[in-house]
From Swiss-Prot:
Keywords assigned: Repeat
GO biological process terms on file: RNA modification
Keyword Repeat: yes
UniProt xrefs under InterPro entries: DYW_dom, E_motif, Pentatricopeptide_rpt, PPR_At4g14850-like_plant, TPR-like_helical_dom_sf
Name of the protein: Pentatricopeptide repeat-containing protein At4g33990
Keyword Repeat carried by entry: yes
Length: 823
């Protein structure tokens, strides 16, 4: 009896009742309908074709595209005894590995008699394809110890790829040298990949330079090695020696251009890919989208995407991410919908982009739907990155409690998870909680902090004024060898600068490479924050002298520094230079700094004219800057005009209602105060409470305006009362204009005395040694009366008092403030 692809009557026992015949008939119907491969096998093994030569058997391997047909072929080879041929058995091993069943491959391999090096190579590479590095090494060791064979050039690439340490790689390197395969292009390229993977790119380059012959694979290995190790500029320099490129080279170099910020070189490579027909290759087009997205060239991204004949999931993810990165969420959502209509199913990367897009839109309900979708898919358990993305999503929405809940729910956490929750707290103003999360991470000791951790927690120290905590982190950085990392040290310098230690910030600045604008921007901003506008301008000129190109952030920090120091002429010079010399189009932040600068200088009409001449539609920050200036300078009429425009674009912002109310209060227009407060109350808006904080004995103490719940409140109040009497004796007169309530003078004086910074000063005078520096951090602008009082206190107590408010630093010493009463 014959059936389908098998001839098995002598090998299968007969079943009673013909049941086995019916089983065979059922199996036959399945095989006949299973696939083209099964039909091909049937055609080759019909009656009269059983004596085909081995060459015909080799052709059958091409038809085996699934495990079932491979097993059919295996059975036939066993029956025909062709399995005894080493070459055929080895091909069967390779087939099983290709189809993903390494266990069957190993079973077949173990039954091969007189295995040759070809069979060993296929088994070793099969383990490598399956990602089983330990079995690759074990199989190679067995080959070297028991086979009595000599490895060839095909043996080493898979083994080198499986090496888990550079020491293991060195051992295999020695073996390749011993057996004479050192300069085989495949082996050499694998060695370059190995050394690059373990950050020994110098060894890789030596090997590359010594190669007598280099093929395209060798060049690609070295270029990608530089990219993997973060040496993008070296990769681009090396590519200058290339006469031709293939698609792999193009993809590596496009990544290098993105990392190095070399847009022009990326365009040149794109032109090459078009000329040589490489742009049409799927992964080249995908990488081009990534390149243009990084530089904000969304039109070019769209052009590349539109020209693609075939688009895969990566293509859609790339174009969606491009619009997400450049904060165009509506277009990104539209593309996501197009992707679904194209029957492309989203993956984790799609959902990560979607989470960011929806957080940009502020759509809380849709964001929760994303979380629900990932839960149903089980991706929280499979991929930690999706959980991290959901934490980021809630943090961007300001829902830090939801972010913390998701973080606590994650089945596993990595360093990125911790960095995400720390930065989420810090970015939403919860500096103490961010520092606490970092301390918890350190106490658990399961996950080591990395660059991202320091860059997340140091801004929290800056925000809270936690200088001692920041100094502890500085010590950790020294211990962990991250002291010379540019981004970490820049964050550290920013921390010192914003905690009032400008000299330490400057010292760190001159210890790191200053080849890009990031460290320069930080130091310029710190000097501006301290009111040292002239020094900020000098730093900017020094930056230009060192050949560093300023970016849009540089000019924001510089204009802000000019604003806080009253340098109107210098600010105008910078604003014009930004456009004429560097081709930077002013953003709303640049315009806002200019309006603020004119307003602080009292040039209110000039500020209004400047707003009317803007090429962009003024937003709330522009009109808010003008309203703030009108409040300081008492121009109620212009303030009303500014507020009308302001509430058109931002009607629900409580801070602007408070600002307008304060302007009316300062002018004694209590009817206007009542009206604005009534409007704010009707909208359900609540005023942000004023608070001040200071660090004492490694603990951050927080004081709220008018709050009487502090354990030492009575002692602090007695200290303030005694101070008040001394201050009046040397000329202090309370300025009731800064009391924003229509009450009696005695009550006004009490309200002024309960401002948060005064409570903090009283606490510091009680809790810290005499004549030591007091550092206070305030979330709102210092009022004029508190500014005067602090000057007097610094004189009679012989203390230096450093106050950082929402705008800048004030250094009070011997009755004088560093701001020169200009803030």
């Amino acid at each position: 009896m014959k059936f389908g692809t098998f001839s098995l009557p002598r090998q299968i026992p007969t079943c009673k009742g013909g049941r086995f015949t019916r089983v065979l008939q059922s199996i036959g119907s399945v095989i006949r309908e299973f696939s083209a491969s099964a039909n091909a096998l049937q055609d080759c093994w019909k009656n009269g074709n059983e004596s085909k030569e081995i060459d015909d058997v080799h052709t059958l391997f091409r038809y085996c595209t699934n495990l079932q047909s491979a097993k059919c072929l295996h059975a036939r080879l066993v029956v025909s005894k062709q399995i005894q041929n080493v070459c055929i058995s080895a091909k069967l091993v390779n087939l099983y590995c290709y189809l993903g069943n390494v266990a069957l491959a190993r079973h077949t391999f173990d039954h091969i008699q007189n295995r040759d090096v070809y069979a060993w190579n296929l088994m070793i590479s099969g383990y490598g394809r399956a990602g089983n590095s330990s079995e690759v090494i074990r199989c190679f060791s067995l080959f070297m110890l028991s086979s009595g064979l000599t490895p060839d050039y095909r043996t080493f690439p898979s083994v080198l790829k499986a090496c888990r340490t550079v020491i293991d790689g060195n051992k295999i390197h020695c073996l390749a040298l011993k057996f004479g395969f050192m300069w085989d292009v495949y082996v050499a390229a694998s060695l370059i990949h190995l050394y690059s993977r373990y950050k020994a790119v110098g060894n890789a380059r030596i090997l590359f330079d010594e190669m007598p012959v280099r093929d395209m694979g060798s060049w690609n290995a070295m270029i990608s090695g530089y990219c993997q190790s973060g040496n993008a500029k070296e990769a681009l320099t090396l590519s200058n020696g290339l006469r031709a490129m293939d698609s792999v080279t193009v993809v590596s170099l496009l990544s290098a251009c993105t990392e190095a910020g070399d847009f022009n070189r990326g365009v040149t490579i794109h032109s090459y890919s078009i000329k040589h027909g490489l742009e049409s290759e799927l992964f080249v087009s995908n990488k081009l989208i990534d390149l243009y997205a990084e530089f904000g060239r969304l039109r070019d991204c769209q052009k590349v995407f539109d020209r693609m004949y075939v688009r895969d999931l990566i293509s859609w993810n790339s174009i969606i991410k491009a619009y997400e990165l450049n904060e165009q969420p509506l277009r990104a959502i539209s593309l996501f919908q197009e992707m679904r209509l194209s029957r492309i199913q989203p993956d984790c990367l799609t959902l990560i982009s979607l989470a960011s897009i929806l957080s940009q839109l502020g759509d809380i309900r849709a964001c929760r739907s994303v979380q629900g979708f990932t839960l149903r898919k089980g991706w929280f358990l499979e991929d930690i990155t999706i959980g991290n993305a959901v934490v980021v999503m809630y943090a961007k929405l300001g829902l830090v409690d939801s972010a913390r809940a998701v973080f606590n729910w994650l089945p596993n956490t990595d360093v990125i998870s911790w960095n995400t929750i720390i930065s989420g707290y810090a970015q939403n103003g919860f500096a103490s909680e961010a520092i606490e999360m970092y301390n918890i991470m350190e106490e658990e000791g399961e996950i080591a902090a990395n660059q991202g951790t320091w860059v997340s927690v140091l801004p929290a120290c800056s925000q809270a004024g936690a200088l001692r905590q920041g100094m502890k982190l500085h010590g950790r950085l020294l211990k962990n060898g991250l002291y010379l990392d540019v981004f970490v040290v820049t964050s550290l310098a920013d921390m010192y600068g914003k905690c009032g230690r400008l000299e330490d910030a400057l010292s760190l600045f001159y210890q790191i490479p200053r080849v890009n604008s990031v460290p320069w921007n930080t130091l310029i901003a710190c000097h501006g924050f301290h009111g040292h506008g002239e020094k900020a301008v000098m730093l900017f000129k020094e930056m230009l002298d060192e050949g560093v190109k300023p970016d849009h952030i540089t000019f924001v920090t510089l204009l802000s520094a000019c604003s806080h120091s009253g340098l109107v002429d210098e600010g105008q010079w910078c604003f014009e230079m930004m456009q004429t010399d560097y081709g930077i189009t002013p953003s709303l932040k640049h315009y806002g700094c200019m309006v603020d600068m004119y307003g602080r200088a009292g040039q209110l009409e000039t500020a209004l004219k400047f707003i009317k001449s803007m090429s962009l539609q003024p937003d709330a920050s522009i009109w808010g800057a003008l309203l703030s200036a009108c409040r300081v300078h008492g121009n109620v009429d212009l303030g009303k005009i500014a507020s009308e425009h302001l509430f058109e674009v931002e009607p629900e912002h409580v801070g602007y209602h408070v600002l307008l109310s304060n302007m009316y209060a300062s002018a004694g227009k209590w009817e206007g105060v009542d009206e604005i407060r009534s409007i704010a109350h009707g909208k359900g808006l609540r005023k942000t409470p004023g608070w001040s904080s200071m660090e004492v004995d490694n603990k951050v103490e927080v004081f709220y305006t008018g709050n009487q719940t502090h354990p030492m409140y009575e002692e602090m109040y007695r200290e303030l009362t005694a101070l008040q009497a001394k201050l009046k004796m040397i000329g202090y007169v309370p300025d009731h204009r800064f009391v924003l309530q229509d009450v009696e003078d005695d009550e006004k004086e009490h309200i002024l005395m309960s401002h948060s910074e005064r409570l903090a000063i009283a606490f510091a005078l009680i809790a810290t040694p005499a004549k030591t520096t007091i550092r206070i951090f305030k979330n709102l602008r210092v009022c004029g009366d508190c500014h005067s009082v602090t000057k007097f206190i610094s004189k009679i107590t012989e203390r230096e008092i450093i106050v950082r408010d929402s705008n800048r630093f004030h250094h009070f010493k011997n009755g004088v403030c560093s701001c020169g009463d200009y803030w």
